[in-house]
């Protein structure tokens, strides 16, 4: 069976054929760095990390680009609220993102481009759109002319007549069309700005991803991913400006979108105030459990957040780890004592082992069905537990089969980014974070009481251990020197 993926652009499953045999170019929209990520933000991180892992597992070289939007209206607004420089605040939350991603065992992308480092590419792309008549300048702003792109709406299925209010639309009565969107925004006092042919300003939201994906993956690449909330207007506008600029269509061959995480059937979002930061959830559940929880549902299906489902994921992960441990213990034992094994038991385990490998591949080849893939691991674990129950003597053939089963557990779980060894490293990281937060709290209390000697002793002692405490208007934070 060949890999088939659901393509939002065609609204059907298609056989996956990359532009270049053996190589996949993938761009995924990353976070806007103005706050800690919430569970809804974490889902695409885990989903596309898993997709990348599987593509590499089956032999592809994957060039994975995930950006950081470090210039945006939300960043500027939040920075004003807390009295911090927007560029510095965005950089701080980039570092916090890396910590959260590590807790979920999300590997770094091949490249993590930042908007602030790609102004030349963004300005050049806007210039081409203006030259081709797809964009126009208006009092220091530059807008994309939606009617100039005849295929507008092909991703979301919306026509110009059907477009509704509620998207990120700039209100400007002078625009040629109400839905024309900003490529460049003229500078405002106190906001970050860059020089351009249209005066000082900063880029609009959509052009940023178009410029960065083009720089690192070219005019046409294989996979563009993100949450379903980005289909319109963000990804629709990306297609319009990219294809209008380059004349190449499609910009991305396959568009993949993960489903929402909901709370009481409403999308989890910062704007609705119904979100839980990943940091909050990590205080109750380890990162590997959260990852397991997110992969227990097909990536395109919604997940309604519920602690009981996280608890079920924790128990499920522990069952797999217990099975792995029992196999290890059996292989470590001499295996010479015990009654003779009932006839057909080894053959049954071997049959399940082969079925698990085949079923896992078929599940992942069917639009990355991680929920079904996990069920293959559970089926194998159940049969392995039955095989080991009863303390029967292990023949050399039994031991060889158990070794193969153990290797398959590790291999397939690894494809999903799940560590069956117990997540010791993640546990250690959580312990360190907890201890550091405790020490910072004690130091803050000492400073409040003007006990400078204790506060300085904590700071200096940590410095000797290679840990630096930084005091900021938002409180103390720590980092490795």
UniProtKB/Swiss-Prot annotation:
It comes from the Bacteria. It is an enzyme of class 6 (ligase). Zn(2+) binds at residues 29, 209, 234, 238. It catalyses: tRNA(Cys) + L-cysteine + ATP = L-cysteinyl-tRNA(Cys) + AMP + diphosphate. InterPro entries: Cys-tRNA-ligase, Cys-tRNA-synt_Ia_DALR, Cys-tRNA/MSH_ligase, CysS_C, Rossmann-like_a/b/a_fold, tRNA-synt_1_cat_dom, tRNAsynth_Ia_anticodon-bd. One of its GO terms (biological process) is cysteinyl-tRNA aminoacylation. The keyword Lipoprotein does not apply. This is Cysteine--tRNA ligase. Coiled coil: none annotated. Monomer. Its EC number is 6.1.1.16. Its cofactor is Zn(2+). GO terms for cellular component: cytosol. A motif ('HIGH' region) lies at residues 31-41. Keywords: Aminoacyl-tRNA synthetase, ATP-binding, Cytoplasm, Ligase, Metal-binding, Nucleotide-binding, Protein biosynthesis, Zinc. A motif ('KMSKS' region) lies at residues 267-271. Transmembrane segments: none annotated. Belongs to the class-I aminoacyl-tRNA synthetase family. GO terms for molecular function: ATP binding; cysteine-tRNA ligase activity; zinc ion binding. It is found in: Cytoplasm. Binds 1 zinc ion per subunit. ATP binds at residue 270.
